[in-house]
Each structure stands twice: as structure tokens, then as C-alpha cells.
Amino acid sequence: VTITDNLGCVLVDYVDIINSHSEITGTLDVLEQVSCFNACDAIAQLSSSGGVLQHTYFWDNGQTYIGSGPDTAYNLCFGGHNIIIEDALGCRKTIPFIITQPDELFAQAVQVQPVQCYGFDDGIAYASATGGTTPYVFVWDDPINGSTGQDIDSLNPGIHTVYVTDANGCTSSDTVVISEPTQLEVIIVDSMTVYSYCAGTNSGQLCAFASGGTPNYNYLWNDGLNQNTSCAYNLSAQFNDYTVIVMDDRNCIASASFQ
């Protein structure tokens, strides 16, 4: 400090400012990060030293604490956070920290194989998952007693659901539709009324018309000639019971008879 009087005399003196209190410091540990996407279940713990006790902690979730710790905060959400430590003299220290979270868990189910023939139960589906925390557990149709694993077979047609649970207990689900063809059917028509009614002639003609199932169709007649076209020719009235067997592209079978 400098003092000057009216005559211009000057006196200079010094004073030492001593900070008798150490700096406020805080030690923060994130004990648990957010377990599932958009959950608020993280846990953090703070302890402090320095300054003048007691300390007051102001958490940004509204929680307060008086002491020097450790103090634990629960139900913290994803994102950046700040804690203010205030000592007995009103001096403050801000401690920033970040809470992380896993990516959102998504389940996906796809049809690998539809039901091959009408009324069968041989569909196959496959499930996968992204996000969350590995490893995953896959359960089909019944989340408690269902079949487990990413692949599932012997499915009947209709909607099937896969439930996925990750290592943190987060869950997701997806559905898949197992399709089936319509029923394979075949009818026999006396083509153009040229069926032979005269004994001893072989001028009859029958045609089979298949529908449903999965085209293309293969035909086999038990006409004595084993013809394998949709129409059978040169048929005799004496052989009065004709049957055609139709097989579609998935080896489904239907038959019809003509007398």
C-alpha cells in the first residue's frame, strides 16, 4: 500500500494475503451408467475435500447433501451433469460429469422359409438384434416358455413374435408373418366333349386344370400311357377310371379322378 501526504511525502508498506484454506476438490465416480436407452437409472457418487467444512453438494437432479461425502445420487439420466460443491464460506467448485447410455435395442424377425404346402407347419424364421448390450437372449412366441434361439423352424402359418432381452435386461420385440400357399387343387374336364364312348376306339381326351399351391405344375396320368402333360390324349372308354396326380413347384401333391 502507498500513502502520500500533502507535502508529497510517500510511505510504502506491504501486506501479505495468506490463503489458509486449500482449494475445494471433488472426486466423482459413476458407479453405474444408464442400463437401457432412455432409462434414468444411473448412479454416481461424490466426495470432497478442501475449503472450509461443512460442504454442501447441489446435484442437478435437485438432490442436496451436507458433509464431505461420499454422497450417492440415483436415477440419473443420460447426458451431461454438474454438481456444485459449496463450502462453509460460500466458496464453490463445479464438478462436471457425463452419463452414457447404450444404443436403443432393436429386434428384427424375418421369414426364411414360408410354409411349403397348404396346412403344413414347416415355416422357418430368423431373428437378429442391434443396440443394447450383448449378449442377447431370443425367445419365440411366449416370452416365458417359448422356444429359444435366433432360428426357429416347424412354424405354422400366421404371425409369430420374437422377444429379445439384452445383458442389462432391456427388451424389444418384433413380429414376422409366416405365409403359406393356397390349397393345391386339380379338376379333370372332358375336353371338348371328345371323350370316346365307342368301344374299341382311343379318341378320348381329358384335361387337368391345377390351381393354388406354387406354380409350375407337373402332371402324371394313370391312363396306361403315363402321360405327363396337362391333357391326356388317345384315351379309351374301356379304361373307365382315370386319375391325374399334380405336383407343384414345392412338391405339394393333389389328385383328381374321372370315371
Q: Across the structure, where does each feature detected by a protein language model lie?
A:
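Short beta-strand segments within Ig-like beta-sandwich modules, predominantly Fibronectin type-III
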Residues: 62-69, 142-148, 222-228
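Short coil/turn motif common to extracellular beta-sandwich-like domains
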Residues: 35-45, 114-126, 195-207
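Conserved structural position at the C-terminal beta-strand
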Residues: 3-5, 85-87, 164-166, 246-248
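Solvent-exposed segments in extracellular or luminal domains encompassing
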Residues: 70-80, 150-160, 230-242
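Short glycine/proline-centered coil/turn motifs in the loop regions
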Residues: 49-53, 130-134, 211-215
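Proline-enriched interdomain boundary motifs that mark the N-terminal boundary
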Residues: 22-30, 104-111, 183-191
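Coil residues (strongly favoring Ser/Thr
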Residues: 6, 14, 30, 42-44, ...
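Edge beta-strands of extracellular beta-sandwich domains
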Residues: 10-17, 92-100, 171-179, 253-259
